[in-house]
Structures are given as structure tokens and as C-alpha cells.
């Protein structure tokens, strides 16, 4: 009888521990975020000719125009108990992650591209001088929100991004073109992980960058300036 009572007590303690663990939430989530252009399909009208290859495209770190207190925050996890936990990127800033993605895409397209330079506030009078470069690309993050609502039996992941890209003539200090794109992803999955959130962010970022460069007017402006 005492043995049964002992087993029952151990069972109750175990269930209590598991219950506490399931209710516990981390103070913050961090995800890897970036764009790998390896498998990107570059439109033929964007690819450089021999004249374009004689110059370098400068890429500036993006600005962040979101109305938020902390520009490192890129989303939230809504736990089962309703608590909202912040999501931050690992080892990078959102503004740098976007600029690096743009750089990777241009390299995939075949252009000579500089490393990501200092942040540009997108005004012609403050345009940084780019060495050996006729054009520079910068831009703004207008929306970037990764959300995961944890529930049973599935977790709902959604990602929203809105980016604006600026193409500038660094010789004449003139903005030549700007374009805005939006990208969204959604996923229902039985499991929850930071890796899965990061993967959804990667997809949305890649989709936004590819949409930007699919615009023929932007491609035409790049070719025009580099062809001078």
C-alpha cells in the first residue's frame, strides 16, 4: 500500500514538473535571418553586359522606418498563455541582413558589387561617396514582422515584409529610381522552433528582394547608368 502511495506521489510530482515546464516561456527568441541567392532565377534583362562589368555597384546598409521602440525587434511569439515574447535576429541587424541579401542577389546576377557600406538616410545631399562606383543601392525597411501563435494542435507562423529600394547616381548625387514591394508567408505546423521562424523570415526576405529586381524599370536604370 505504501509502495503504491509512493508511486502515486512520484507521478503527481512528475506531472507538476512537466506542467511547469510546458508553461514556462523564454524571455526572448532569436532567429537566423538572411537571403541565400544561390538558387535565384535572375531575369535575362537584368544581367550585365561587358560595359556594366567595368564598374562596381555600391550597396548601403538599409534604414529602418518602422514605428517601433527597438529596431532589433523583428517579431513576436504569442505563447499558449497569451504572453508575447520578442523575436530578434542572431548576429546581425535587420537593416544589414536586407542589404546583404540585396548584395547577394546582385552578385548572383553577375555584377561586381562592393561590400555593404555605411547606412544612408536616402537623401541626395547626404549620399556617401562610393569609390569606383557609378551607382549605389540603399533602401528602407517599412515593415518586418514575424509572428508565431503557439496553439494546439498546430502553430501558426506568419511573416510580413515591406521594403523600398533606392537607386542612386553617385557621380551626380541624384536618386534615379525607387520601388516598394511587399512579401508575406504563412505556415501551419505541429512543432515550434526558432529555426522554423527563421526559415519563414528567409523566404519572405528572398521573395521581397527578387520582386524588387524583377521590375524592368529598375533593371533598365541600372543598365543605363553602368553603360555610360
Language-model segments: residues:
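A structural "domain/chain start" motif
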Residues: 23-105, 212, 216-228
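Surface-exposed patches in mature extracellular/periplasmic domains of secreted proteins
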Residues: 113-119, 151, 220-224
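Short secondary-structure boundary motifs at beta->alpha junctions and helix caps
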Residues: 73, 79-91, 168-214
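Short beta-strand->alpha-helix linker/helix-N-cap micro-motif
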Residues: 103-125
Amino acid at each position: 500500500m505504501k509502495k503504491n502511495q509512493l508511486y502515486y506521489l512520484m507521478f503527481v510530482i512528475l506531472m507538476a514538473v512537466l506542467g511547469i515546464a510546458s508553461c514556462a516561456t523564454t524571455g526572448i527568441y532569436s532567429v537566423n535571418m538572411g537571403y541565400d541567392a544561390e538558387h535565384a532565377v535572375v531575369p535575362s534583362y537584368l544581367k550585365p553586359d561587358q560595359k556594366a562589368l567595368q564598374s562596381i555597384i555600391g550597396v548601403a546598409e538599409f534604414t529602418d522606418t518602422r514605428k517601433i521602440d527597438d529596431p532589433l525587434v523583428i517579431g513576436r511569439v504569442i505563447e499558449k498563455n497569451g504572453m508575447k515574447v520578442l523575436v530578434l535576429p542572431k548576429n546581425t541587424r535587420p537593416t544589414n541582413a536586407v542589404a546583404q541579401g540585396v548584395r547577394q542577389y546582385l552578385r548572383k546576377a553577375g555584377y561586381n558589387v562592393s561590400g555593404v557600406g555605411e547606412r544612408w538616410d536616402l537623401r541626395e545631399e547626404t549620399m556617401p561617396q562610393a569609390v569606383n562606383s557609378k551607382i549605389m543601392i540603399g533602401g528602407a525597411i517599412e515593415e518586418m514582422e514575424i509572428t508565431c501563435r503557439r496553439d494546439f494542435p498546430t502553430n501558426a507562423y506568419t511573416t510580413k515584409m515591406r521594403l523600398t529600394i533606392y537607386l542612386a547616381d553617385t557621380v551626380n548625387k541624384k536618386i534615379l529610381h525607387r520601388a516598394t514591394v511587399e512579401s508575406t508567408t504563412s505556415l501551419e505546423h505541429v512543432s515550434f522552433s526558432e529555426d522554423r521562424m527563421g526559415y519563414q523570415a528567409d523566404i519572405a526576405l528572398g521573395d521581397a528582394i527578387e520582386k524588387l529586381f524583377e521590375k524592368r524599370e529598375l533593371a533598365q536604370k541600372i543598365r543605363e547608368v553602368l553603360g555610360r
